[in-house]
Amino acid sequence: MRLAVVCFCLFGLASCLPVKVAEFGSSEEKAHYSKHSDAVATWLKPDPSQKQNLLAPQNSVSSEETDDFKQETLPSNSNESHDHMDDDDDDDDDGDHAESEDSVNSDESDESHHSDESDESFTASTQADVLTPIAPTVDVPDGRGDSLAYGLRSKSRSFPVSDEQYPDATDEDLTSRMKSQESDEAIKVIPVAQRLSVPSDQDSNGKTSHESSQLDEPSVETHSLEQSKEYKQRASHESTEQSDAIDSAEKPDAIDSAERSDAIDSQASSKASLEHQSHEFHSHEDKLVLDPKSKEDDRYLKFRISHELESSSSEVN
């Protein structure tokens, strides 16, 4: 890689060097070249107008560099001419000197042209590097954030109001009227929602009452059975007391008058308790709804109680 770079550098330096005419050959060729040297020099020289146009924009190269370059090139050419040529070939030296100057001028013109091109390319690149501000090209919808749905909704809410309906109205009046219309619509919507919700509440209340009644029915039945059992126990207890009283009444010789009075009082209290129990039983019958079996039991109890009361009253009399 290094060798390739060195070769390219040498090739570039060789191409930059001015072309020199070969000084070998016979005296006839030299004389022929000396005769036509002026024609060749004029042919190599460009027009003065073109030279001015090419040298005018050259600002990068200073005068000192050009003087140094000329001082380096002229002595080398003079040394080479003294070494290879004789004193008789002074005219040829003049021609070579003119050719060397022309070649130097042509090289300078080429360098100036390249410098102009580099300046133009540099300015173009700097202009291209300057960034232009990016302008938004898409319309942003009105509303909160960039939500398109909210923008469309806000646009749909803006109803066009014609001037024929409100010729003397201002923007504030129109907005107040729109708000009042929206509030009226909301007020109309609320009673409808309440009406729709009321039947559901009634249905729910009906369902709950029906369920509670269904749940209470077995409790009523159990309560009626418990009361019938209590009545049976009380009736049996009272019957035993009455039988004891009857037995004591059948033995008047053994029982004193005080005991008789106590027995009479106990019978009266038993009657009052029986009447009270019968009254309570009737009241419970009116309140409760009993099964047919419980009704039959109650009838049997009533009949038995009434029979016992009649028997006790007949015995007392």
UniProtKB/Swiss-Prot annotation:
InterPro entries named among the record's database cross-references: Osteopontin, Osteopontin_CS
PROSITE patterns: OSTEOPONTIN (PS00884)
Residue positions, PTM Phosphoserine: 26-27, 60, 62-63, 76, 78, 81, 106, 109, 112, 115, 118, 176, 180, 200, 204, 209, 213, 219, 224, 228, 257, 261, 266, 270, 273, 278, 283, 294, 306, 311, 313-314
Bias (Basic and acidic residues) ranges: 174-187, 223-240, 248-263, 273-297
Record motif Cell attachment site, residues: 144-146
Subcellular location per the Swiss-Prot or TrEMBL entry: Secreted
Transmembrane segments: none
Cellular component GO terms, alphabetical: apical part of cell; cell projection; cytoplasm; extracellular space; Golgi apparatus; perinuclear region of cytoplasm; vesicle
Keyword Cell membrane on entry: no
Quaternary context: Interacts (via N-terminus) with integrin ITGA9:ITGB1.
Protein name: Osteopontin
Species assigned in the record: Rattus norvegicus
